[in-house]
Swiss-Prot record:
Probably interacts with PlsX. One of its GO terms (biological process) is phospholipid biosynthetic process. This is Glycerol-3-phosphate acyltransferase. SMART domains: G3P_acyltransf. It is a multi-pass membrane protein. It holds the Pfam family G3P_acyltransf. Belongs to the PlsY family. The lineage of its organism: Bacteria, Pseudomonadati, Campylobacterota, Epsilonproteobacteria, Campylobacterales. The gene is plsY. Catalyzes the transfer of an acyl group from acyl-phosphate (acyl-PO(4)) to glycerol-3-phosphate (G3P) to form lysophosphatidic acid (LPA). This enzyme utilizes acyl-phosphate as fatty acyl donor, but not acyl-CoA or acyl-ACP. The chain crosses the membrane at residues 3-23, 61-81, 87-107, 118-138, 144-164, 172-192. Pathway: Lipid metabolism; phospholipid metabolism. InterPro entries: G3P_acylTferase_PlsY.
Amino acid sequence: MQNLILYAVSYLLGSIPSGLILAKIFGHVDIKKEGSKSIGATNVLRVLKQTNPKLAKKLAILTVVCDVLKGVLPLIVASFLGASQSVLWTMAVLSVAGHCFSIFLGFQGGKGVATGAGVLAFFLPVEIIIALVVWFLVGKFLKISSLASLCALIALIASSFIIHPELDEIYTHAPILIIAFLVVYKHIPNIVRLLSGKEQKVV
């Protein structure tokens, strides 16, 4: 019963559309109707930057923090409760699934990057540092958020197989690959635009 509660909490917290809520409360704008129509930090920044650059940066950062925490906090609580690695990994997948397919948004949602990074940092801190370095470098020089995220994801997956050939207790990289699949799936429109040279930059 405890595990079922943990799973439900992970999905429901993951489903909270942080960026959408913050943009509506403080920016008085519905980001699902503006810009890329995504609920993530990049769209918060892009949309609000047009009218209030300082607020845009603050809300974008706060969106990232909230999206990370909604994935990490349930894992921290569950670990204190003695949850096994298999339960924790299942919670991680459900948190990202909640963000990508939010029950509060008719099973629409964000791209899962910040929430995915948060839950993976809980298990794979070294790999996340590597991924963040890649994300920063690609983002800084190419200024394309989606490309930076996808390159960081590839770096994380590759480094996880090198640093952790077998994950503790579960002995499989399946949860990482499922999270990666969710993120890539939600990035399909971005990938299409990247291939056609039409993806927007974050200036």
